[in-house]
Amino acid sequence: AEKKPVKVEGEARQKGDAPCMIIFCAFDQQMYLIELAKRYGLNNYINLVFRKNFSAQVLKANMKVVGNCEYGLILYRDRLPKFRNNGKMIFNCIDWPRDNESEKIHPTQKPVELLKRLIEIFTDEGDVVIDPCAGSGSTIVAAERLNRKGFGFEIKKEFYTKANQWIMEEKQVKLDVKQFG
């Protein structure tokens, strides 16, 4: 039996205000995730390619062409998701800036600046951003910097502890700025 899509209460009814889900994944995971998403009513998608000017495969550089891309999907229901592009064209191939500022907490940690850009495009101030695989907490830090409500989940205690510390430091900096600013 085919699973019926879950109806989300309070889901946006206006054009351009619907939520979306962004998933980072390996290239070969995309079709599986698209099919899985359809079971839950996320019938539409846009492929994303994140282009790096560096590669983790540096030791293989003399043996073969090395990968410098990460992949992702924007998943959404039937209405186009909220899209705040300020009249600028947004391509599905996005530059991945190297993050030399943030402490490396997690092996697949995403750059805060990249996450901020995605959050700015698909949310407004005060919106909720959820990261079900929070890892380093960089998505929550990015959301916090943009005045969004961030919620993250992490099952590994070592990552949770470090991520939580980073998020709390970020919130403290924000409080200090508000208090003295």
Locate each region found by the language model.
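Short, conserved SAM-binding/catalytic segment
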Residues: 164-178
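Acidic, PIN/NYN-like endoribonuclease modules and their adjacent C-terminal/linker elements
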Residues: 181
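Core catalytic lobe of class I
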Residues: 1-152, 156-161
